[in-house]
Amino acid sequence: MKSSPFASDCTPLIKLFLQYKLTLALAESCTCGLVAAQLAPTEGISDVLLGSVVTYHALAKQKLLGVSAETIELYSAESQQTTNEMAMGLHRHLPEADVCVAVTGLCGPGPSATPDKPVGTVFVTIFIDKHAHEYRTQFKGDANSMRQQAADFIYQQLTELLTRLQPMVKPEKP
């Protein structure tokens, strides 16, 4: 696994959120709260992070975020469709969040793994400015390594997205 600038320091990312006066909410499955935990020590986080919900099991995804049983049955709990519903459900429950991030994936063997979706497949949805940005990626290593890679991937995508969309997001107030 290559070294990441994010695992130990999320300051540049949080500075972007602060600069644009944006808030963040997370729905984490395969990362088990790691994304929020690594953001927590960052200066300014209390002005950015509204909360994080860990919805590891399909039942939690359904009960806490409103993911439909049909989506899970058709596509599995670890799919882009489920991740999208997680992000949208999070936004429905917490509309004050400017950015909603959801993550699911396979960091270990299980019944959802297939040749088309092997262990290491991770799905991320970032909902911002009424648009869902979907990502599917693949990681290698043990479960903890894959969780860290997924967290780093989320930090990287958020940084790139906020930088790219800066004219669309809330301007800094004087």
List PLM regions with ranges.
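Short alpha-helical segments enriched in small residues
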Residues: 1-174
